[in-house]
């Protein structure tokens, strides 16, 4: 990679701004976040005009409704972005937090302390609200960010970033930057090891896989959400249906929506029809195996690869399983490691499921929609990690830090 590339220049400027950010007090960072929120409110007309151009272009290009919904900004959504920045300002600052501390036999005090990561690159698809969320979390945790949005949201991202940057002092303005250009620019960002400390991709499987396989910079993988709900033999059917409806239909285009329901054969006769009733009333098409179709002919046949789909739409896969072990095996084969749910009255089933399923979040008798930084009390999240290092699950402020060891003595030398 050429040392004179635009991405390298941006990363160097971001590093300089991050150095200033590291020294800011919490009150200073909180004031900046509030100012960025004001910038969004002041710039609402410009942001809406830019977003309208992006949406029109996307619609003309045949963008599907799920992506158009993610792309679209409204006055209410922009206000939500501003409120989100203010919410981050009210969160505890993890920087400087002592994780643990002890004294050596010679009296040296050792503390493990949270510090910013540095320069974080975020590559994401058609969601302009991610722009403000990412900038807010990075700034509060003392990091600079290089934001690589999709071309479909270019005008929106330009307007959002311009509105926020207009309220930042010059010495840290480059802590929030938009990375523009073609695919070669994305490749430069992914290979800018030594200039960019961390990459976080947010989007569909294609984007995430491309970043994970092509990056030389360390990556936190925010996986796709092929999430399951298991209705165990002891489940309260009404509870299970209510949870399934919420998890599927509240926002079908997000990663914590369920895509598949697995029903224990012992309860299928009483659970399948109420489930299909509730889903049909809300416009959901249920795709199932032969056994489920025999129980309710409204179910359409599932294609061979149906259970690997992250629909992000009003579609739901359904399968009858012999027992909980088969459900867990199905999840291991088809799941994405995001969020997995069981509805059951059995404590042993709860414990077996929680200890057997390999996922960032396991839910018992509650909706997968709770797997969210806001619901966890983290404030705005940078994404939901489905890997095991360096973070797993919703990533808030603490997940945007690393640690350093600070040793204090009074002249000790090692014997």
From Swiss-Prot:
The record, for InterPro entries, names:
Ald_DH/histidinol_DH, Ald_DH_C, Ald_DH_N, Aldehyde_DH_dom, G-glutamylP_reductase_CS, Glu-5-SA_DH, GPR_dom
Q: Which organism is it from?
A: Cutibacterium acnes (strain DSM 16379 / KPA171202) (Propionibacterium acnes)
GO cellular component, alphabetical, reads: cytoplasm
Query: What keyword terms does UniProt attach to this protein?
Result: Amino-acid biosynthesis, Cytoplasm, NADP, Oxidoreductase, Proline biosynthesis
Family membership: Belongs to the gamma-glutamyl phosphate reductase family.
Q: Name one GO biological process term.
A: L-proline biosynthetic process
Q: What does this protein do?
A: Catalyzes the NADPH-dependent reduction of L-glutamate 5-phosphate into L-glutamate 5-semialdehyde and phosphate. The product spontaneously undergoes cyclization to form 1-pyrroline-5-carboxylate.
User: What is the name listed in the Swiss-Prot or TrEMBL entry for this protein?
Assistant: Gamma-glutamyl phosphate reductase
Q: Where in the cell is it found?
A: Cytoplasm
Q: Which GO terms describe its molecular function?
A: glutamate-5-semialdehyde dehydrogenase activity; NADP binding
Report the gene name: proA
A Pfam family hit: Aldedh
Checking CDD domains in the record gives: ALDH_F18-19_ProA-GPR (cd07079)
Q: Which NCBIfam families match?
A: PRK00197.1, proA
Tell whether tRNA processing is among the UniProt keywords.
Answer: no
> What EC designation does it have?
1.2.1.41
Q: Which reaction does it catalyse?
A: L-glutamate 5-semialdehyde + phosphate + NADP(+) = L-glutamyl 5-phosphate + NADPH + H(+)
Tell me the enzyme class.
oxidoreductase
- What metabolic or biological pathway is this protein involved in? Amino-acid biosynthesis; L-proline biosynthesis; L-glutamate 5-semialdehyde from L-glutamate: step 2/2
Q: Does the keyword Cytoplasm apply?
A: yes
């Amino acid at each position: 990679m050429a040392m004179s590339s635009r991405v390298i220049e941006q990363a160097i400027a971001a590093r300089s701004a991050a150095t200033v950010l590291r020294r800011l007090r919490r009150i200073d960072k909180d004031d900046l976040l509030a100012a960025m929120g004001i910038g969004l409110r002041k710039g609402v007309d410009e942001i809406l005009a830019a977003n309208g151009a992006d949406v029109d272009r996307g619609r003309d290009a045949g963008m599907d409704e799920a992506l158009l919904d993610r792309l679209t900004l409204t006055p209410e959504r922009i206000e939500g972005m501003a409120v989100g920045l203010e919410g981050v300002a009210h969160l505890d600052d993890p920087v400087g937090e002592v994780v643990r501390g002890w004294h050596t036999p010679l009296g040296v005090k050792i503390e493990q302390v949270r510090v910013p990561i540095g320069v974080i690159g975020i590559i994401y698809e058609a969601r302009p609200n991610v722009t403000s969320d990412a900038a807010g979390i990075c700034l509060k945790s003392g990091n600079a960010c290089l934001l690589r949005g999709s071309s479909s949201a270019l005008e929106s991202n330009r307007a959002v970033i311009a509105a926020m940057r207009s309220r930042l002092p010059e010495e840290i303005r480059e802590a929030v930057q938009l990375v523009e250009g073609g695919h070669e620019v994305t490749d430069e960002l992914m290979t800018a090891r030594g200039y960019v400390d961390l990459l976080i991709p947010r989007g569909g499987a294609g984007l995430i896989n491309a970043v994970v396989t092509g990056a030389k910079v360390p990556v936190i993988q925010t996986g796709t959400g092929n999430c399951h709900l298991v209705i165990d033999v002891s489940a309260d059917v009404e509870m299970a249906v209510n949870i399934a409806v919420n998890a599927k239909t509240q926002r079908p285009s997000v990663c914590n929506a369920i895509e598949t329901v697995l029903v224990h054969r012992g309860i299928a006769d009483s659970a399948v029809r109420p489930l299909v009733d509730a889903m049909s009333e809300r416009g959901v098409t249920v795709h199932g195996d032969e056994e489920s179709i025999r129980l309710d002919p409204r179910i359409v046949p599932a294609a061979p690869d149906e259970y690997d789909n992250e629909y992000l739409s009003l579609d739901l896969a359904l399968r009858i399983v012999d027992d909980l072990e088969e459900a867990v095996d199905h999840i291991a084969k088809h799941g994405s490691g995001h969020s997995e749910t069981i509805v059951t009255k059995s404590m042993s089933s709860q414990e077996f499921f929680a200890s057997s399923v390999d996922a960032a979040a396991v839910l018992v008798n509650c909706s997968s929609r709770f797997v969210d930084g806001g619901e966890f009390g983290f404030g705005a999240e940078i994404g939901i990690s489905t890997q095991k290092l360096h973070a797993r699950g919703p990533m808030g402020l603490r997940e945007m830090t690393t640690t350093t060891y600070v040793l204090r003595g009074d002249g000790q030398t090692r014997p």
